[in-house]
From Swiss-Prot:
Transmembrane segments: 19-39, 43-63
Localization annotation: Membrane
Residue ranges of coiled coil: none
Protein name: Immune protein Tsi5
Primary localisation category: membrane
GO CC terms: membrane
Annotated knockout phenotype: Deletion mutant together with deletion of toxin Tse5 leads to a significant loss of fitness advantage when placed in competition with parental strains.
Gene behind this protein: tsi5
Keywords: Membrane, Transmembrane, Transmembrane helix
Keyword Repeat: no
Length: 76
């Protein structure tokens, strides 16, 4: 079976996606560690962290909406 025309390996778009997710997740993980150090292992830590995630997602939604970008998962 000829492999001409097939690309092997990982595409540049996939690498870019994983690097972007890493850049987003590392600060969030550090935030959680700092909250856990400051508040201890309590529900306050989880509540503050969850609130930050909701605010970030809402900000992303409003930004994408202002640029005219639609979220595809809302149509399902």
């Amino acid at each position: 079976m000829p492999t001409e025309g097939r690309r092997r390996g990982v595409s540049a778009a996939m690498i870019k996606h994983y690097l972007l997710m890493t850049l987003v997740c590392i600060p969030l993980a550090l935030l959680y560690v700092c909250l856990e150090w400051f508040f201890g292992n309590t529900w306050v830590t989880v509540g503050v962290f969850f609130g930050v995630l909701v605010v970030l997602r809402l900000g992303l939604y409003l930004y994408r909406r202002s640029k005219g970008i639609r979220d595809g998962y809302l149509d399902e």
